[in-house]
UniProtKB/Swiss-Prot annotation:
A single cellular component GO annotation: membrane
Enzyme Commission designation: 2.3.2.27
Gene Ontology MF annotations: transferase activity; zinc ion binding
Entry superkingdom: Eukaryota
Low complexity composition-biased segments: 306-324
Zn finger (RING-type) start-end: 127-169
Pathway: Protein modification; protein ubiquitination
Signal sequence range: none
Lineage of origin: Eukaryota, Viridiplantae, Streptophyta, Embryophyta, Tracheophyta
UniProt cross-references to InterPro entries, sorted A to Z: Znf_RING (IPR001841), Znf_RING/FYVE/PHD (IPR013083)
The protein, known as: RING-H2 finger protein ATL3
Swiss-Prot/TrEMBL GO biological process terms: protein ubiquitination
Species for this entry: Arabidopsis thaliana
Length: 324
């Protein structure tokens, strides 16, 4: 009897310990699940919160950029009215200037509006803009020339930037309306065309009034100043004072040579050009350094060079300077 009691007590003790351990494991699982759920909810909340903050910052930046652009365009910026804009299609404009202008509200109202009926079109009709079929009772705008029909909202949005049919590309306006529209556009561009014609006339006058130089004279300079090789030698003529009405200052040096001394003049012009190039090279510090390096390297191999400079006493130089 005592042995039976001991076995029963040991069995009940084992059952109680198993129940306790199972309860502990269950509570631990529940606590872990709640912790994971709490972290997940906190993560979602933080993500939504920061997403809203980012959206607000982006909207503020966009508003600031729009305000800056408006201030740049006009000194007095109009009051900014924030409105919720509807999404719309953006169509690429064509090459024709008339098709890019679009239709006015008066021209849109002149186009007929019909209510779609299933009896009139057994096969069904599809709007080529929104790619959806017309249902019974839908408002459709019928184009008079090509007899194509579309939803009123779709075709009105298309006609904001176009004046042709989106399928066949035929003009919706008649020839009289299109010609009147072109005539309205011509006066706007008349002033610009006048200014461009005036500019072309001025350029042609400048090109015709440009001085002509002989072929044996070296000429260089800018648009408002013309000079030749010997700018320091010459005399001013009193007879050239009558041509001082021109606005641009011009200094011209002409080398007048005889037929017997053409070869001498060619050599003198080349020597004068060489002298000018040498003067320009002497002014730059890079050339002086190279020259000193050359002298240092060739100090043992110096060879006497004789520079022949021919001066022609028979050639006479005339300098004509025209002041404004």
């Amino acid at each position: 009897m005592d042995d039976n009691r001991s076995t029963h007590s040991s069995m009940f003790g084992d059952l109680s310990t198993e129940e306790v351990t199972s309860k502990i494991i269950l509570t631990a699982i529940i606590v872990l699940f709640m912790a994971v759920l709490f972290v997940l909810i906190l993560h979602l909340y933080a993500k939504l919160y920061w997403w809203r903050i980012d959206q607000l910052q982006q909207q503020q930046q966009q508003q600031q950029q729009e305000q800056e652009q408006e201030e740049d365009q006009s000194s007095i910026a109009p009051p900014v009215v924030t409105r919720r804009q509807r999404r719309r299609f953006i169509f690429v404009p064509g090459q024709d200037a008339l098709s890019n202008t679009g239709l006015t509200s008066f021209e849109l109202s002149s186009l007929p509006i019909v209510f779609f009926r299933q009896d009139s079109c057994k096969d069904g009709l599809e709007c080529s803009i929104c790619l959806s079929e017309l249902v019974k009772g839908d408002k459709a705008r019928l184009l008079p020339k090509c007899n194509h029909s579309f939803h009123v909202e779709c075709i009105d949005m298309w006609f904001q930037s176009h004046s042709t049919c989106p399928i066949c590309r035929n003009t919706v306006l008649g020839p009289e309306q299109a010609s009147s529209k072109r005539v309205e556009q011509v006066p706007d561009n008349a002033e610009n065309a006048g200014t461009t014609n005036n500019n072309h006339d001025a350029l042609s006058q400048l090109s015709t009034s440009s001085p002509e130089f002989p072929t044996n004279v070296l000429v260089w300079g800018r648009q408002d100043q013309v000079s030749t090789g010997n700018t320091n030698v010459g005399t001013q003529e009193d007879g050239a004072a009558g041509n001082g009405a021109s606005q641009s200052q011009e200094a011209v040096v002409l080398d007048i040579s005889d037929s017997s001394s053409r070869n001498h003049n060619v050599s003198s012009s080349s020597s004068s050009m060489r002298f000018i190039v040498e003067e320009e090279e002497a002014k730059s510090p890079m050339t002086t350094r190279l020259r000193s390096l050359r002298r240092f390297l060739s100090r043992d191999k110096r060879v006497g060079c004789s520079n022949s400079s021919t001066s022609n006493s028979s050639s006479s130089n005339a300098v004509a300077s025209v002041d404004p």
